[in-house]
Curated annotation (Swiss-Prot):
Protein's recorded name: UPF0225 protein NTHI0386
Entries under InterPro entries matching the protein: NTF2-like_dom_sf, UPF0225, YchJ-like_M
NCBIfam families linked to this entry: PRK01752.1 (NF002486)
PANTHER family reported for this sequence: ADENYLATE CYCLASE-ASSOCIATED CAP C-TERMINAL DOMAIN-CONTAINING PROTEIN, UPF0225 PROTEIN SCO1677
Length: 161
């Protein structure tokens, strides 16, 4: 948590929103508020990686996927990566409870400066946004969706991945 304490004094939030960290992603990291949009969650997750706040990454992943994550590997990756910038390319409201955010993140890895571009899917469960992680084992198309709404995966979040 010392990274977060240090970040609270940052004038500009690492998510590049042009807001002070404490008024932007900091309030989410400290659980003083929850992101109201998928884009806010995307920005707060990026900032969590910048600050190596892996517990936040885990709790903002779809609840049914959280136990499938490997926090130690996420921490190792975060420790070996220097984040240089975030650009939100597009946000889409897919349904009332599902949104997509396309972004590009620039980072310095072991191989040099790289860009990661992705279209991420977010789901709103009980009035909170979560990231649907496509890198962990997903249900088959006929199994219940990871979001818990009771639809088959193929007719819910699976249709957007």
């Amino acid at each position: 948590m010392s990274e977060i304490s240090t970040a609270l004094s940052l004038e500009n939030c690492p998510c590049q929103s042009s807001h002070h960290y404490a008024d932007c992603c900091g309030k989410f990291h400290l659980r003083q508020a929850f992101p109201e949009t998928a884009e806010q969650l995307m920005r707060s997750r990026y900032t969590a990686y910048v600050l190596k706040n892996i517990p936040y990454i885990v709790v903002t992943t779809a609840p049914s996927q959280q136990t499938l994550l490997k926090p130690r590997l996420l921490q190792e990756w975060a420790d070996n990566t220097t984040w240089l910038g975030l650009e939100i390319l597009k946000t889409e409201s897919l349904t009332k409870t599902q949104s997509a955010v396309e972004f590009k993140a620039i980072f310095q890895g072991e191989e040099g400066e790289l860009a990661h571009q992705e279209r991420s899917i977010f789901v709103k469960i009980e009035n909170r946004w979560y990231f649907v992680d496509p890198t962990v084992s997903l249900p088959t198309m006929k199994q219940p969706c990871v979001c818990g709404y009771g639809k088959k995966f193929k007719h819910c979040c699976g249709g957007f991945l």
